[in-house]
C-alpha cells in the first residue's frame, strides 16, 4: 500500500500516507503478509516477515480507546554476517523497535483521521450506548476530537 483514500458518508475524503495506510490495515486485521522494516542492533535495516496479525479494539471509559494488536512474525530467512559470525536472531531491543514501528503506524492513522474529524476505527459504534441520540446526530464531530487513543503491540517470533 502506498496510499489509502478514506471517504465519509458526507462525501469528505482524506488520503492516508503509507504508514497510516499500514496502520489501518493492522487494526482492520487485513495485514497478514509483507514485511516490517526496523533498525537492527548493528544500525542496519533489517526486516521480519508478517505471518499473521490480529487486533482487538476496545473502548475504556468515555473517551479512551485502545487497539491491542498481536503479531506473529518470522525472521527473514537470509542470515546476516557480523564480525564473521552468522546473525539470525532478534534481540529484545529489536523486538521493541518492531513494536514501536507498528504502534507508530497505527497512531499515525488515527491522528490523521482525528484531525479530519473522521472516525476511521468506528469507535463511535462502541460509544453509542453511552452517548445515545446525541451521537447519532453529530457522529463525527461530537466525540472524535476528544478520544484518547493508544495501541498495545505484542510480537511473537516464530
Feature map (PLM): residue ranges:
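Membrane-proximal alpha-helical signals and transmembrane carboxylates
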Residues: 1-158
Amino acid at each position: 500500500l502506498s496510499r489509502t483514500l478514506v471517504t465519509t458518508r458526507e462525501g469528505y475524503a482524506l488520503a492516508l500516507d503509507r504508514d497510516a495506510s499500514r496502520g489501518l490495515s493492522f487494526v482492520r486485521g487485513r495485514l497478514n503478509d509483507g514485511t516490517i522494516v526496523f533498525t537492527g542492533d548493528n544500525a542496519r535495516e533489517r526486516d521480519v516477515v508478517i505471518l499473521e496479525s490480529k487486533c482487538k479494539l476496545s473502548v475504556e471509559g468515555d473517551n479512551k480507546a485502545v487497539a491491542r494488536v498481536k503479531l506473529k512474525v518470522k525472521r527473514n530467512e537470509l542470515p546476516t554476517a557480523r564480525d564473521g559470525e552468522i546473525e539470525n536472531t532478534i534481540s529484545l531491543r529489536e523486538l521493541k523497535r518492531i513494536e514501536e514501528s507498528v504502534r507508530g503506524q497505527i497512531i499515525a492513522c488515527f491522528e490523521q483521521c482525528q484531525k479530519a474529524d473522521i472516525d476511521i476505527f468506528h469507535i463511535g459504534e462502541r460509544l453509542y450506548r453511552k452517548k445515545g441520540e446525541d451521537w447519532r446526530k453529530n457522529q463525527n464531530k461530537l466525540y472524535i476530537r476528544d478520544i484518547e487513543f493508544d495501541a498495545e503491540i505484542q510480537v511473537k517470533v516464530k
